[in-house]
Amino acid sequence: MQYDCSGSWLNAKRQRINCHKEQGHGTQTLVQAFANSCNPYFAQLVQSEQLPLSRVIETFTKMGYAVNGEKGKRLLMDGITASPATVTLADPKDFDTQWGCLGQGDTLISPYQLMLWQTAVASGTGKSVQPYVIAAKTDAEGNRTEQTVRQSSEQLFSATTAQAVRDVMTQNAAAYYKDSLGDYVCGVKSGTAQIIDHGEEYENSLLVGFSMQETCPVAFCILIEKRTAGELTTASLAKVLLDALQDMT
C-alpha cells in the first residue's frame, strides 16, 4: 500500500494532518512510512477502505486497549496494577480518529504496556512475556529460591505480524540508530508528541524497543518530557541502560 506525503494532507472533512517533515516524504510504502513516522501516510491509511475501522478496533482491543469507553483489562505485575491503554475511534474520516490511531489525540498508554507489546514483537510469537519484580530470593546460607515461572499472555497479534514488525524495527535501528546504540542488535521506534499546555508549546520524545542480545534480552521505553533539540536523546539513554544491564550479567 502506497500513499503520498507532501508535508500536509487534508482528510475528507477538510481537516489538516501535518508531517514533521515540512517538504514531505513523497510516495511511501508502509515500511518506509513506519521508519519515517509519517502522519499523513497513516491518516490516509485509516481513512481508506483498505483498512476498515472495525478491524482497527478489533486489533486494538486484542492488544489491550479500552476502546470508545469500554472497560479494559487492568495490567498486573507481581500484585502491582496499571490501567489499560485508552483511545476513541469513531469515524475514520475524522481528524480525532485518524490522530488517535497514530497514538496522538486523547490516546493514553503506560510505558509498561508499550514494553509488553515489545516483548510480543521481539519474541516473534505475538504473545507478551509476563514481567516480574523479584526473580529470586537468596537466604543467609546462600540458598537461592526462584520466585517466578516464565509466563506468556494470550495472543495479542499473529506471529506473522510480530515477525514482520520485528524485522522493520531492527532495520530501522540499523539504519538510523547505529551511532547511538553502538553494536547492540536492537529494534526501535521513536515517537514525538506535540504538546500545547496553557499557551506553552513543547515536545515529548519517546523511544520504545528491544534488545536482541542473548546477554541482554530486554524491552525498553524511554520518555523525555519537554525535550529541547540538541540536548540528550532517548537513544543515548537507551545505550546507557543497555550498557548497565550488560555489566550486570
Tell what function each PLM region has.
Residues 1-222:
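Beta-lactam-recognizing serine transpeptidase/beta-lactamase-like catalytic domain environment
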Residues 224-235:
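A short acidic/glycine-rich loop-to-helix N-cap element
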Residues 143-152, 235-249:
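Short, gly/Ser/Thr-rich active-site loops of penicillin-recognizing serine hydrolases
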